[in-house]
Each structure stands twice: as structure tokens, then as C-alpha cells.
Amino acid sequence: MVKADMQKRALGRGLSALIPQAGATGAGKGEQAPKAGVLKLPIESIHRDKDQPRTYFDEEKLKELSESIKAQGVLQPILVRKDGDGYRIIAGERRWRASQAAGLKEVPAIVRDVTEVQAFELALVENLQRADLNPIEEAEGYKRLVDEFKLTQEQVSVRVGKERSTVANALRLLALPTDVKGMVADGSLSMGHARALLGVPRLPELQNLAKQVADKKLSVRDTERLVQQSRSSGKKDAGKAAPKQSPQVKALVEELQRRLGTKVRLTERSPGKGTIEVDFFSYDDLDRLLKLLRKE
């Protein structure tokens, strides 16, 4: 129990909390080395984790790392866990790939006894701290913790050392169409651009605006203006001029948004009648809203 608690507290600090400094313990030549130390494991006994958060590796940078490893060796051990007769990577797949390319037969590694969820959390935290994940990979990592491991957004934020709002905003990106998510993943669009584009309700228009923003390299502020113009134009094209809201109604909407912590739209269809729309961005977010409404 103490061991599990120590691992959980260490997650937000990354793998440095779980990996001893190189040289702090003698590196053995085989699995007979002390469990807490650095082992030299056969490279063919180590396998990548198909569910690891990072999916893209820059080939040019891999080549550079491979050349560095040929000259200097692997300076930081990879982190693995036992998997059948071999080992599965928790963190360090890039170093492992580069070591293979460099022709190494063994790599320094540390074996850790962790659960699947702990292994995924460690991989996610390490990639976040190294800024190795693009925004979509980061969002998909959070989503897996929520969907597969049944963590709430609040629990995810604690585990990875991020604000809950950061986790919630990242998850919102997954509502974007595939082609636009691709632009965010390859850096053509930033998180700020993506958040602005989420305000476009019609899918074809969102895709067109995203391409325009990427092609013209517009700033986030310019993108926000473009989205606002698009929304205003769409309302005019529909022939439905939005009725001017009274100060009382505006105040009510602002109060609802403050209490619920999300976007709220109020439409009056006739005096005293209308509809209220409340945005949510995941089942976890919906559950949070329902608890607020039930005053749980």
C-alpha cells in the first residue's frame, strides 16, 4: 500500500521521481542486477506499448538521436515493466527506436512493477513534461484515462499535475472533425486556433475556416474575429435576426454560465417562453453538470 501511494504521489513529478540518477547505482550486465538499479536488457526482449500516448516520431530527430547514441551511448535509461517473457516500454520508446537504429544489442533500463493504469499515467506525464505530445495526442491520453480507466476529469488533473480546466479544454479538441484535428496535430493550428474554431456550429464551414486560418497563418485573435464574422453572417443568411436580449436576460445567462462553468445560450421564442442550451464536452462533464443541477 505504501509503495502504491508513493507511486501515485510521484506521477505529477514525472519519471524523475521513480528513476534513480544514472551512476547512483551500478549498472549490471544482466537481470541479476539489483531491482532498484539500472539493468542492461537485450534490445530484442523489449517491446513498444501500442497504447502509449505518443504516436508520432520525427524521423529526422530520430536519426539525430541515433547518431548521438552511437557516439555517447544511451545516457538515460528507459522505463519498462515485465510482460510475459519480455518487457514492455513505459517511457523511452524514442530512445529504444534510436538504439535499434544505432545497432545496439542492449539498452539500459529500469524495471518497475506497476499496474496498467499507472504505466499509462507515467507515460503520459513524462511525455507532457518533455512536451513530446501534440495537443491531440494529449487530449486522447486524457480521454483514455476517463473512458477506459474510469477517472473523472478532476482525478485526471491531479494525476498528471494539470489544472482541471486544462484537461477539459484539451478534451474539447476531440469534437473537431478528423481533418481539423490533423491540422492541430501537425502544428498548422494551435490550441488557441482550435478553441476558437469550436465556436463554429456548421461542420463544412468549420473545415473551410480551419483551412483558411492554416493557409494564411492567421493569429488566434484574427481567427476569433473570423469565427465571429462567420457566426453573424450565418444568422443573417438564415433570415433570423437574433432578438436583442434585455439586460435582465443577459444577467441571467451570465449567472447560469458562472454557476455551471460552461457556455449557456438562452433563446426567447415568445414573451416568457424559450429554450436554454447548455454545452458539455464529455460524459464526465455532463455528470458534473447534472450533479450541480441536482445540488449533490
Swiss-Prot record:
Disulfide bonds: none annotated. Residues 134-230 are annotated as: parS-binding domain (PBD). Keywords: Chromosome partition, Cytoplasm, DNA-binding, Hydrolase, Nucleotide-binding. It catalyses: CTP + H2O = CDP + phosphate + H(+). It is found in: Cytoplasm. Residues 39-128 are annotated as: ParB/Srx nucleotide-binding domain (NBD). Residues 223-249 are annotated as: Disordered. The active site is at E93 (proton acceptor). The record marks Q52 as: May stabilize catalytic product and decrease reverse reaction. InterPro entries: Chromosome_partition/occlusion, HTH_ParB/Spo0J, ParB/RepB/Spo0J, ParB/Sulfiredoxin_dom, ParB/Sulfiredoxin_sf, ParB_dimer_C. CTP binds at Q52, R54, S68, G73, L75, Q76, G92, E93, R94, R95, E126, N127, R130, A131. The keyword Mitochondrion does not apply. Residues 247-296 are annotated as: C-terminal dimerization domain (CDD). Disruption phenotype: Essential, it cannot be deleted; depletion experiments lead to abnormal morphology, chromosome segregation anomalies and cell death. As ParB is depleted Smc levels drop, suggesting ParB is important for Smc stability. GO terms for molecular function: DNA binding; hydrolase activity; nucleotide binding. GO terms for biological process: chromosome segregation; positive regulation of sporulation resulting in formation of a cellular spore. Mg(2+) binds at E126, N127. Has 3 domains, the ParB/Srx nucleotide-binding domain (NBD), parS-binding domain (PBD) and the C-terminal dimerization domain (CDD). Forms loose dimers via the CDD; in the presence of parS-containing DNA and CTP forms a closed ring around the DNA. In complex with CTP part of the NBD exchanges into the other monomer, forming a tightly interlinked domain with 2 CTP nucleotides shared between the 2 subunits. Belongs to the ParB family. Homodimer. Forms a loose homodimer, binding of parS DNA and CTP cause conformational changes including formation of a tighter dimer, and closes a clamp around the DNA. This is Chromosome-partitioning protein ParB. The lineage of its organism: Bacteria, Pseudomonadati, Myxococcota, Myxococcia, Myxococcales. The gene is parB.
